[in-house]
C-alpha cells in the first residue's frame, strides 16, 4: 500500500506526465522540422485519465491484485476474470491497448515476455505484455482492513457531469461572474446534486474515501484533537471526517452539520449527531469547529461570511480547524504545487469563486472574520491544518 505522500500525488503529480517528452523553447529542430509529435501529444493527454477511468470501471486494479502480491499478468488473463467480457473474443486485445498506455504512464508496471502459440498449425513465438501494480495504482485497490481505495474520488473528478464543465472553461475569461458548471448544466453544483441522486452519491462517495486517507495523515502529524471535548464539522458531508475523529478520540462529542439533502443520506456513527441546516445562514453552537475542504469552494466574501458565522457560535478561546491543500508561494513541478493547482482549476470550473489559497490568504480571511490568531501546521505534500483562534 502506498504511503500518505504517494496518496497525495493523486491530483496529477505522478508519473502520468511521463508520456510528454521534452519540449524546447524553439518551434523547430536544427533541421527545420517542427516538433509536431510533441506538441500534438499535449492535446491527447485526455486519453490517460479516460483510460484510467475505463480501467477502474472494469475493476482492473483489483483483478490484478487477486493474482497475488507483485503479480505480473497479461491482458488476456485479466479479461478472463471479467464476466461481462466473456462473450467478446477481442476483449483481451482492446484491454491490452488501454493497459499499455497506463503502463507507459507508470500507473501500471509493464514488461514483455515471450510465449509460444499455435497459428495455422505452426508454433509461433510472440511477445506478450505483462502488467502489475505500482505505488500509484495500489491506491486504487480496496485495502483489506477497511475496503478503502481512491477509486470513488477519481470517478467523481472524471464523471461526465464534471468533465462537461471543462468544455465551458474559457467562459470564466470571457464573461464576468461566469461559472462553467452552471453554463453547462443550468444550476449550481450543490443545487444540481440535491436533485440528482446519482451525482449526489458520486460526490459524497468521492469525498468520503479521500477524507479517510487524509485523516490518517492528519492524525500522524497533528495532535490538536487531544484536549477537545466537542467538535462541530461544518459542511461535513455524510459525516465521514468527524466519525473518524471521534473513533480516534472517543471523548469528543461529534456533530456533523450540512445541508438537508446531504444529511438525509448520512449513515449513523457512534458518538456523532447529524444536524441539517445552511452554514451561510447560521452555524450551530460548538466549542470547536472543523472546515475541511469547505473554504476552497467559495470566494473571499462568502468565506468571510461563513467564518463570521463560525466566530459568532464559538466561545472565547474556541478555534476553527481548516484543512486544505495550500498553494505554495513558489510553484514547481512537484506534488506540493500540483496538489493545489489541479483542484484549483477544478474549483474554477465547478463553483463560483472557488479557489485554493496561500497561507497568507487564509490568514487574511481569518482576520477579516474576527479571529485573533492563525496557526498553520503542515501535514504532507501541501496538505495543512490551519487553526483560527477566537
Curated annotation (Swiss-Prot):
Quaternary data: Homodimer.
Residues engaged in binding S-adenosyl-L-methionine: 207, 211, 235, 258, 278-279, 292
Gene: SOMT1
Tissues and organs where the protein is expressed, per its UniProt entry: Highly expressed in capsules. Expressed is stems. Expressed at low levels in roots.
Pathway(s) served: Alkaloid biosynthesis
S-adenosyl-L-methionine as UniProt keyword: yes
Catalytic EC class: transferase
Keywords associated with the record: Alkaloid metabolism, Methyltransferase, S-adenosyl-L-methionine, Transferase
BP term (GO), one: benzyl isoquinoline alkaloid biosynthetic process
InterPro entries: COMT-like, O_MeTrfase_dom, Plant_O-MeTrfase_dimerisation, SAM-dependent_MTases_sf, WH-like_DNA-bd_sf, WH_DNA-bd_sf
Entry protein name: Scoulerine-9-O-methyltransferase 1
Reaction catalysed by this enzyme: (S)-scoulerine + S-adenosyl-L-methionine = (S)-tetrahydrocolumbamine + S-adenosyl-L-homocysteine + H(+); (S)-tetrahydrocolumbamine + S-adenosyl-L-methionine = (S)-tetrahydropalmatine + S-adenosyl-L-homocysteine + H(+); (S)-norreticuline + S-adenosyl-L-methionine = (S)-norcodamine + S-adenosyl-L-homocysteine + H(+); (S)-reticuline + S-adenosyl-L-methionine = (S)-codamine + S-adenosyl-L-homocysteine + H(+)
Entry superkingdom: Eukaryota
Catalytic site positions: 296
Amino acid at each position: 500500500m502506498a504511503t500518505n505522500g504517494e496518496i497525495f500525488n493523486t491530483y496529477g503529480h505522478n508519473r502520468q506526465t511521463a508520456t510528454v517528452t521534452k519540449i524546447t523553447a524553439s518551434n523547430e529542430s536544427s533541421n527545420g522540422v517542427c516538433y509536431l509529435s510533441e506538441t500534438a501529444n499535449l492535446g491527447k493527454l485526455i486519453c490517460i485519465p479516460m483510460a484510467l477511468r475505463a480501467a477502474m470501471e472494469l475493476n482492473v486494479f483489483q483483478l490484478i491484485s487477486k493474482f497475488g502480491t507483485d503479480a505480473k499478468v497479461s491482458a488476456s488473463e485479466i479479461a478472463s476474470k471479467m464476466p461481462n467480457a466473456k462473450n467478446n473474443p477481442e476483449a483481451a486485445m482492446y484491454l491490452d491497448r488501454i493497459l499499455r498506455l497506463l503502463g507507459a504512464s507508470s500507473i501500471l508496471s509493464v514488461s514483455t515476455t515471450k510465449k509460444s502459440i499455435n497459428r495455422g498449425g505452426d508454433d509461433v513465438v510472440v511477445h506478450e505484455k505483462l502488467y502489475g501494480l505500482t505505488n500509484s495504482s495500489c491506491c486504487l485497490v480496496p485495502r483489506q482492513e477497511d475496503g478503502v481505495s481512491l477509486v470513488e474520488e477519481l470517478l467523481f473528478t472524471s464523471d461526465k457531469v464534471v468533465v462537461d464543465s471543462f468544455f465551458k472553461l474559457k467562459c470564466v475569461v470571457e464573461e464576468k461572474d461566469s461559472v462553467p458548471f452552471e453554463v453547462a448544466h443550468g444550476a449550481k453544483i450543490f443545487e444540481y446534486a440535491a436533485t440528482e441522486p446519482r451525482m449526489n452519491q458520486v460526490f459524497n462517495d468521492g469525498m468520503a474515501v479521500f477524507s479517510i486517507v487524509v485523516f490518517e495523515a492528519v492524525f500522524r502529524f497533528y495532535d490538536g484533537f487531544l484536549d477537545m471535548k466537542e467538535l462541530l464539522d461544518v459542511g461535513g458531508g455524510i459525516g465521514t471526517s468527524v466519525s473518524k475523529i471521534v473513533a480516534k478520540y472517543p471523548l469528543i462529542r461529534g456533530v456533523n452539520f450540512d445541508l438537508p439533502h446531504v444529511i438525509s443520506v448520512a449513515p449513523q456513527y457512534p458518538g456523532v449527531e447529524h444536524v441539517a441546516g445552511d452554514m451561510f445562514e447560521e452555524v450551530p453552537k460548538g466549542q470547536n469547529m472543523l472546515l475541511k475542504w469547505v473554504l476552497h469552494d467559495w470566494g473571499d466574501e462568502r468565506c468571510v461570511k461563513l467564518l463570521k458565522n463560525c466566530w459568532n457560535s464559538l466561545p472565547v478561546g474556541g478555534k476553527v480547524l481548516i484543512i486544505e491543500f495550500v498553494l505554495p508561494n513558489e510553484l514547481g513541478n512537484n506534488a506540493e504545487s500540483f496538489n493545489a493547482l489541479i483542484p484549483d482549476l477544478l474549483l474554477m470550473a465547478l463553483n463560483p469563486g472557488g479557489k485554493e489559497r496561500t497561507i497568507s490568504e487564509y490568514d487574511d480571511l481569518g482576520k477579516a472574520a474576527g479571529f485573533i490568531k492563525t496557526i498553520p501546521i503542515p501535514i504532507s505534500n501541501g496538505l495543512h491544518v490551519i487553526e483560527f483562534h477566537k
